[in-house]
Amino acid sequence: MAKRTKKVGIVGKYGTRFGASLRKMVKKIEISQHAKYTCSFCGKTKMKRKAVGIWHCGSCMKIVAGGAWTYNTTSAVTVKSAIRRLKELKDQ
């Protein structure tokens, strides 16, 4: 493995290649894709990325389709909140 420093973090493996601004963009993406997320089924922080858009919970063993780099996409969150709001209006 290549040496990483405090400043560059996970993108230290690229060395001086590709330019600083591109490495900063990739750093943001790689940190979010390697992070563990909270499972929406069991509530534990065990949701990890298996492949592009496929997320697996190590606790309840659920496999969920999500975003490519993050568990929830912004459009999915918007749709979920709209559905929840419509259900609440229907119940009233």
UniProtKB/Swiss-Prot annotation:
Localization of this protein: Cytoplasm
Entry keywords, A to Z: Cytoplasm, Metal-binding, Ribonucleoprotein, Ribosomal protein, Zinc, Zinc-finger
Keyword presence, Translocase: no
GO process annotations (BP): translation
List of residues binding Zn(2+): 39, 42, 57, 60
GO function terms (MF aspect): large ribosomal subunit rRNA binding; structural constituent of ribosome; zinc ion binding
Chief subcellular location: cytoplasm
Function: Component of the large ribosomal subunit. The ribosome is a large ribonucleoprotein complex responsible for the synthesis of proteins in the cell.
NCBIfam families, alphabetized: eL43_euk_arch, PRK03976.1
Subunit structure, as described in the record: Component of the large ribosomal subunit.
Protein name listed in UniProt: Large ribosomal subunit protein eL43
Organism for this UniProt entry: Xenopus laevis
Record gene name: rpl37a
